[in-house]
Amino acid sequence: MSDDLVVQRKEGLYCPAGDFYIDPWRPVDRAVITHAHGDHSRRGNAHYLAAAPAEGVLRTRLGEIDLQTLPYGVEIDHFGVRLSLHPAGHVLGSAQVRLEHEGRVWVASGDYYVAGSSADPGEDNPTCAPFEPVRCHCFITESTFGLPIYRWQPQAELFADIDEWWRDNAEAGRASLLLGYAFGKAQRILKGVDRSIGPIFVHGAVEPLNRAYRAAGVDLPETPVATEVKDKALFRRALIVAPPSAQGSTWTRRFGDYSDAFASGWMQLRGARRRRSVDRGFILSDHADWPGLQRAIAATGAERVIVTHGYEAVMVRWLGDQGWEAGAFATEYGGEDDELPGAVGAAATASEQAAEHVAESISDAEAARIVVAPDDLPVDDAGA
């Protein structure tokens, strides 16, 4: 529509009324950044605007940039567009972008995490502010895990499983190497595990981000870098957190006998676990699962929904069947694909090829069962 508040351009998602972009994938003059993952925040923009809690991680990842920050919920006016940022629950500093112009309200979600069908605050991501539904006329949503097979287990159960794996390894004198994305996933792991089991060490790519989290007030354990450990005997009871790129590298030889595991939402797929060639797969994601996506969308009260990266075809079809006006933007965002190089990424891609079949298989009964009333989510409905 010609009067849309956000349109798609070759540089990224563009707000014509405000003359700025949201998470552009090519360099632009003004970029509003939803969070510091590499597919949403790129180098080369002249000016950046992001939520205040994101400053440390953005500067850690992008270096010296012209960055303006905005506290959550504080509104600014830019060329007549009223703009504010609201928590997305994804990673430290993640934000949804609320735009209001001439009576219309749009919200661009970026990536977000909602705890499925549960209203238990214990299911929120404990390393950042929880997702805040914002009332709007149009909601631009991700769909990284937009298939019915993706349903996250309660966090207490998940971390009990991780702790049991680590404890069993420690009792056997074997190091525990847990692979997960260096920004967001690693800190979620460090926050959730039982620190009493043994020492915790990290890869050198993880610790700078840990420092940014601690500076923002997030309680994380002390995490010496593994390469600085002098007493190699400590590794026999240790948990070592590292990015996926460390798997099978010469860096791992220092640990001697070790068991490895991978933490990702993609571990829900048996093929991904097999192709990753790890001893264990833990299903841990910083994105909303299928029920979480439905719950978040319903809570906005939006009449129109535009789907971005992930399983767009499935989500658009499902939304249309439920009565929403639905469409999609073709973006260059990668979801968690950065965590799945090589054959594992191919496994996820192969599962996308089955999307149309999966969409056909969602019965009315299934749709009715997974739609959760949004009444249990606190909603910011200012201006909409």
PLM features per residue range, with description:
Residues 159-241:
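Hard-cation-handling environments
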Residues 195, 226-384:
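C-terminal regulatory/interaction regions
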Residues 59-61, 78-82, 117-119, 149-150, ...:
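Short, charged, surface-exposed secondary-structure boundary motifs
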Residues 4-23, 215-238, 242-251:
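A short, well-structured beta->alpha microelement
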Residues 66-71, 197-204, 323-332:
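Short hydrophobic/aromatic-enriched beta-strand-loop microsegments
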Residues 41, 94, 116-117, 186-189, ...:
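Short, well-ordered alpha-helical microsegments
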Residues 2-17, 21-26, 30, 36-177, ...:
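His/Asp/Glu-rich metal-coordinating catalytic cores
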Residues 91-99, 112, 116, 138-144, ...:
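Active-site-proximal loop/helix segment associated with metal-binding centers of metalloenzymes
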